């Protein structure tokens, strides 16, 4: 399988690639991807969980037990649970968010999709998401998997990230550019 060397060159990319290969061999790619999405949501919502994975004072066994409990609460599959245990045993839990992102990119590339992250000041409705997905599909020529988030600090407009490309049409960026131009 051909994977971007940029993804696999990083530590998190190597872990994600290994997990993808295991999941692919066992036919669990979509199940593992769903598990990782649950974990990602839990990491975004829980400051305690985020603190747990970034705590360097936590021992391997403690981290493993804590993550096993989290995996049980989230209903994660056996492969994902074992993988998170390996990260805990290797003291690499802090890489988990990057591993999740890299796994998603690898899985999307395998399906011929491109992942796009869209940040807006307000939640987008279904029609806006559909229209944006179509525009991005026309621009890239590939199927788009859209992940949306809300950041009121951008004031308005959108910030779209597709792979290493970023399209920033936020009002905050425009105001910052105007302020810089006025200083010059």
UniProtKB/Swiss-Prot annotation:
GO function term, MF aspect, one: proton-transporting ATP synthase activity, rotational mechanism
Pfam families cross-referenced by the UniProt entry: OSCP
An annotated GO cellular component: proton-transporting ATP synthase complex
Keywords: ATP synthesis, Cell inner membrane, Cell membrane, CF(1), Hydrogen ion transport, Ion transport, Membrane, Transport
UniProt membrane topology term: Peripheral membrane protein
Primary location: membrane
Origin superkingdom: Bacteria
Keyword Cell membrane assigned: yes
Location in or out of the cell: Cell inner membrane
Gene3D superfamilies per UniProt: N-terminal domain of the delta subunit of the F1F0-ATP synthase
Quaternary structure and partners: F-type ATPases have 2 components, F(1) - the catalytic core - and F(0) - the membrane proton channel. F(1) has five subunits: alpha(3), beta(3), gamma(1), delta(1), epsilon(1). F(0) has three main subunits: a(1), b(2) and c(10-14). The alpha and beta chains form an alternating ring which encloses part of the gamma chain. F(1) is attached to F(0) by a central stalk formed by the gamma and epsilon chains, while a peripheral stalk is formed by the delta and b chains.
Family named by the database record: Belongs to the ATPase delta chain family.
Function of the protein: F(1)F(0) ATP synthase produces ATP from ADP in the presence of a proton or sodium gradient. F-type ATPases consist of two structural domains, F(1) containing the extramembraneous catalytic core and F(0) containing the membrane proton channel, linked together by a central stalk and a peripheral stalk. During catalysis, ATP synthesis in the catalytic domain of F(1) is coupled via a rotary mechanism of the central stalk subunits to proton translocation.
Protein name: ATP synthase subunit delta
Species whose genome carries this gene: Novosphingobium aromaticivorans (strain ATCC 700278 / DSM 12444 / CCUG 56034 / CIP 105152 / NBRC 16084 / F199)
